[in-house]
Amino acid sequence: MNVDFLCSLPRAGNTLLGSIINQNKNLNVTANTILADIIYQLHLLKKNEIFLNFPDEKSLNNVIKNSFNNYYKDWEAEFIIDRGPWGTPDNLKILKSIIKNPKFIILNRPPLECLASYIQIEQPKN
């Protein structure tokens, strides 16, 4: 299994890209996953009183590093593009400690266009 990452603004074309790529059974783009949050919460355990009482950082790092394999264990695709908030500073730092050279797909759509697309779908039909 090979995991890469999709980080883009909402309404930038993530769903369209995912629906095109997901036509290939060997390649899957996820919906917005909770994996980034799972790994972040595991990382926060390093500040927990129970952990600090017996700081076995190596074992906790093993759990964190195996999160990707465990989360995607039942996925049949060889390549997975995880769509989540991996570009935030804390998530990116943790991700780089797990995967040395993570690869990102970033869809570039001007932020004002993304915002305008929200307004367009929320506008009353009258």
Regions found by a protein language model. Name each.
Residues 73-74, 101:
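Residue-level detector of alpha-helix boundary/anchor positions
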Residues 18, 69, 92-96:
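Short amphipathic alpha-helical segments and helix-helix/interface helices
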Residues 44, 79-126:
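PAPS-dependent sulfotransferase catalytic domain
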Residues 1-68, 74-75:
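PAPS-dependent sulfotransferase catalytic core
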